[in-house]
């Protein structure tokens, strides 16, 4: 079939298949993956689909079993996983866990050719600290956080924001392309995280804005689907409305249709907003809306909603009284 008559969906599927095929032209790589949560499990699965040999670790046995069923090798110790991997990708919840994981993983030494790739969302300062520690041991470390959520992880359409040298970026690009469609070199170590924190701050602000607007429209008598269609064909169009709408029934695949289960938890975006606030304070950058968004999501966590998807903020907006 000629490319010019392919539908957009068919063309995207074809291009993703081509990218994956090209990623293993030099031979399948041994890739370690630590952290098999909502994002990590899907990212790891796409590496297997691309033909790489996957080595995995997670504290959750069911998560490990799910990848083992697809062909991955499960390890009891991350240090052993790292010694058997050309690349090691980490996808973990916070600074403390990432820091401790790398200490454990590299305690017995590292292979000189291994490249460690952290795709968690952590502080730029921790990135720089880890890079120095691992470089001193003879290996390489870069930051490569992601955007695109669980749908992007499932479909291998994530955006990767890479911090490191140009040579390191080129060395990891083919591996990252197995999991994403946009791989951007943001600059030196920590710049990937700087981009990610700014993006997530904007995401939180936009989700609150969409939730406020949707709630106001519904209370005026507008149908939620009608108003969402208007937003998505007007100047208010954004990812939080078009792909991840917080109102149940508007976007079939959004967490709003599963009682806000799964997805990107309110606890995690609260953590990210805290990191963004720290970076803003250190650089003397005003973030009035970012600070307010942090308070809103901290309020959600205080109300016991930290495990719910961050779009649950709409559910709180529906209540007659809402306060931060």
Swiss-Prot record:
Active site: 196
GO terms (BP aspect): valine catabolic process
Entries under Gene3D superfamilies matching the protein: N-(1-d-carboxylethyl)-l-norvaline Dehydrogenase, domain 2, NAD(P)-binding Rossmann-like Domain
Gene: Hibadh
Reaction equation(s) it catalyzes: 3-hydroxy-2-methylpropanoate + NAD(+) = 2-methyl-3-oxopropanoate + NADH + H(+)
Record-linked PROSITE patterns: 3_HYDROXYISOBUT_DH
A Pfam entry, by short name: NAD_binding_11
Claim: Mitochondrion is one of the keywords in the record: yes
Name of the protein this chain belongs to: 3-hydroxyisobutyrate dehydrogenase, mitochondrial
Family of the protein in this entry: Belongs to the HIBADH-related family. 3-hydroxyisobutyrate dehydrogenase subfamily.
Binding residue positions for NAD(+): 29-58, 92-93, 121, 271
Originating organism: Drosophila melanogaster (Fruit fly)
GO molecular function: 3-hydroxyisobutyrate dehydrogenase activity; NAD binding; NADP binding
InterPro entries assigned to the protein according to its UniProt record, in alphabetical order: 3-OH-isobutyrate_DH-rel_CS (IPR002204), 6-PGluconate_DH-like_C_sf (IPR008927), 6PGD_dom2 (IPR013328), 6PGDH_NADP-bd (IPR006115), HIBADH (IPR011548), HIBADH-like_NADP-bd (IPR029154), HIBADH-related (IPR015815), NAD(P)-bd_dom_sf (IPR036291)
Pathways per UniProt: Amino-acid degradation; L-valine degradation
Range of the transit peptide: 1-25
Protein keywords: Branched-chain amino acid catabolism, Mitochondrion, NAD, Oxidoreductase, Transit peptide
A GO CC term assigned to this protein in UniProt: mitochondrion
Primary location: mitochondrion
Membrane-spanning segments: none
Cell location: Mitochondrion
EC number annotated for this UniProt entry: 1.1.1.31
Domain of life of the organism encoding this protein: Eukaryota
């Amino acid at each position: 079939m000629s490319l010019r008559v392919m539908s957009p969906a068919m063309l995207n599927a074809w291009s993703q298949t081509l990218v994956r095929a090209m990623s293993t032209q030099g031979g399948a790589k041994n890739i370690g993956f630590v952290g098999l949560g909502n994002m990590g499990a899907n990212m790891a699965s796409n590496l297997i689909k691309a033909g790489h040999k996957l080595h995995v670790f997670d504290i959750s046995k069911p998560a490990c079993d799910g990848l083992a069923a697809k062909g991955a090798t499960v390890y009891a110790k991350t240090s052993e996983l790292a010694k058997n991997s050309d690349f090691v990708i980490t996808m973990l919840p916070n600074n403390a866990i990432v820091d401790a994981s790398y200490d454990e993983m590299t305690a017995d030494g590292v292979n000189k050719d291994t490249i460690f790739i952290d795709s968690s969302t952590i502080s730029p300062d921790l990135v720089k600290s880890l890079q120095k520690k691992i470089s001193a041991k003879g290996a390489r470390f870069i930051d490569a956080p992601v955007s695109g959520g669980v749908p992007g992880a499932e479909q291998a359409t994530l955006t990767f924001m890479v911090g490191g040298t140009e040579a390191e970026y080129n060395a990891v690009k083919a591996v990252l392309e197995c999991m994403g469609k946009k791989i951007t070199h943001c600059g030196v170590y920590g710049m990937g995280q700087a981009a990610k924190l700014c993006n997530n701050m904007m995401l939180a602000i936009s989700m609150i804005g969409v939730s406020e607007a949707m709630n106001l429209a519904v209370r005026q008598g507008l149908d939620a689907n009608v108003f969402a269609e208007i937003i998505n064909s007007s100047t208010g169009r954004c990812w939080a409305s078009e792909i991840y709408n917080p109102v149940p029934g508007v976007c079939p695949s959004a967490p709003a249709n599963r009682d806000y289960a799964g997805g990107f938890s309110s606890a995690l975006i609260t953590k990210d907003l805290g990191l963004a606030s720290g970076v803003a304070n250190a650089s003397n950058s005003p973030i009035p809306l970012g600070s307010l968004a942090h308070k809103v999501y901290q309020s959600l966590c205080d109300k016991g909603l930290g495990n719910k998807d961050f779009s649950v903020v709409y559910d709180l907006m529906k209540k007659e009284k809402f306060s931060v």
